[in-house]
Design a protein with these regions (language model features):
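Mid/C-terminal beta-alpha module of Rossmann-like enzyme folds, strongest
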Residues: 200-261, 277, 283-311
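N-terminal Rossmann NAD(P)H-binding glycine-rich loop of SDR-like oxidoreductase domains
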Residues: 5-25
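Conserved beta-loop-beta element that borders a ligand/cofactor-binding pocket
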Residues: 136-156, 166
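Substrate-positioning beta->alpha
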Residues: 159-164, 179-201, 208
């Protein structure tokens, strides 16, 4: 493929999977930008021939010269969890402002911005507020762009969310669940979402917004049971009152600089969102992978399921 693709936040869950897919599809000019040098090293080992750039987009630097009128820029960088509001402001808002300024100065053929379903959710936390602001920056930038809003994603190279829970389940005889665990989720398989991103890179639908929602509605507790099943584990699931669970999370956060699961995420889990999205087959040309098959591929694949990136 002749198009040059520049990916920000390239060493995270979406970025690792997207770059790997782009290389599988024959894209030769891929630039991966991330501030996490160790995770970029993992990416370099997975996808040979990718140009990797260690850079913090909130700070001026040589990275600002990486854009040109022949490039499609995929905006993935995001602060998803954290203890301090300023982390979200810095990495979701300030970094995006500087990125858009660099693109204005140098040019780009198109921007594919990955937002989040939280911008249309009932949640009100630092992640939601700053993702709303980030999306608005892109939408008002006057640059050619489209926006995709995925629901909770899972798959290879996931240091957070279901990936972390999957690994935690392997290490403990007891797995705690808040309340009855019947919090409806619409998880989206990362390889399916990357197929939508590739479509956007190739079709460049200007000023369009796509809500990309996992096809299966499933309760959180049933997701945990399915992960346990496909991995052949015998971990006991124990239900803990939601209030106590929240208090335990807040206490844990006092002693951890990077808590894997926060009280804000628990509130988002129990918010009761029910998202509607585009028909992925009609719009992007693919039918979503059946959920159990996707979970099995995510956590049992002999090539990639054991590859870890840092949070």
């Amino acid at each position: 493929m002749s198009v040059r693709v520049v990916v920000t936040g390239a060493a995270g869950l979406v970025g690792q999977n997207l770059v790997l897919m782009l290389k599988e599809l024959g894209y030769e000019k891929v630039v991966a930008i991330d501030k996490h040098a160790g995770n970029l090293e993992v990416l370099r080992g997975l996808a040979s021939g990718v140009e990797t750039v260690v850079a913090d987009l909130a700070v001026p630097g040589s990275w600002e010269g990486l854009f040109d009128l022949e490039s499609v820029v995929v905006v993935l960088h995001a602060q998803i969890t954290g203890k301090h509001p300023q982390e979200f402001v810095r990495n979701n808002i300030e970094a995006t402002k500087r990125l858009l300024e660099a693109i204005h100065a140098r040019g780009a053929r198109f921007i594919v911005h990955v937002s989040s379903s939280v911008v249309v959710s009932v949640a009100h936390d630092d992640y939601t507020r700053t993702k709303e602001a980030q999306e608005k920056l892109v939408a008002e930038s006057e640059l050619p762009h489209c926006i995709l809003r995925p629901t909770l994603m899972f798959g290879w190279f996931d240091p957070k969310h279901l990936g972390w829970l999957s690994r935690f389940m392997e290490k403990t005889p007891v797995f705690p669940i808040p309340g009855d665990g019947k919090f409806m989720r619409q998880p989206l398989y990362i390889r399916d979402f990357c197929r939508a991103l590739v479509w956007a890179i190739e079709h460049q639908p200007d000023r369009q917004v796509y809500d990309v929602v996992g096809a299966q509605r499933i309760d959180y507790v049933d997701i945990i049971r399915l992960i346990r099943k496909v991995k052949g584990l015998h971990t006991r699931i124990v239900h803990i009152p939601t209030g106590l669970f929240r208090a335990l999370l807040r206490t844990y956060a006092l002693f951890s600089s990077r808590p894997p699961f926060t009280a804000d995420q628990l509130d988002a889990l129990s918010a009761g969102d029910d998202f509607s999205g585009v028909d992925t087959e009609a719009v992007f040309g693919f039918r979503q992978t059946p959920f159990e098959e996707a979970v099995r591929e995510s956590y049992c694949d002999p090539r990639y399921s054991r590859v870890l990136v840092e949070r």
